[in-house]
Amino acid sequence: LHPRVRRQRQMCIRDRFYTDQPEGIIGNEDCGQMSAWHIMSALGFYQVNPSNGVFVFGSPLFDKASVHLPEGKTFEVVAQNNSKENVYIQSVLLNGKPYNNSYILYDDIVKGGNLTFVMGNTPNKEFGAAPENRPKTAE
């Protein structure tokens, strides 16, 4: 799916099916997997295939969050211009450098560092749209 379509679906699921009401998580919690998806999605990325180490970008819920890793490392996620209206990724920086992929690898996350999303209120149809910037599919 195009990154713009993924974000729309992710936000629909997050906003409709994860609430603070008694029925806030729909269906079977699936041994914590649905809650894990919600936390990762709130950071702005989530795994579609749990075995390949690829996390596709969505829309961050937080302006800033830190993931504390082993050996004192931290992976910081920042969402600039983040708001209810600004839900579309305009650009991404990984460790201060432009990053054109619409996904990040597990290996990049566990190294520690900084992932910055620059958000806007209209889709950037160019971001992550090129085939080389999309996650590889199983063949």
Sequence positions of predicted segments:
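C-terminal substrate/ligand-recognition segments
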Residues: R7, I25-V48
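Alpha-helical multipass membrane-protein architecture
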Residues: R7-Q10, A42, N52, E85-Q90
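A glycine-rich phosphate-binding loop feature that marks nucleotide/adenosyl-phosphate handling sites
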Residues: R14, N28-Q33, V56-F62
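Long, well-ordered core segments of solenoidal/helical folds
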Residues: R14-Q21
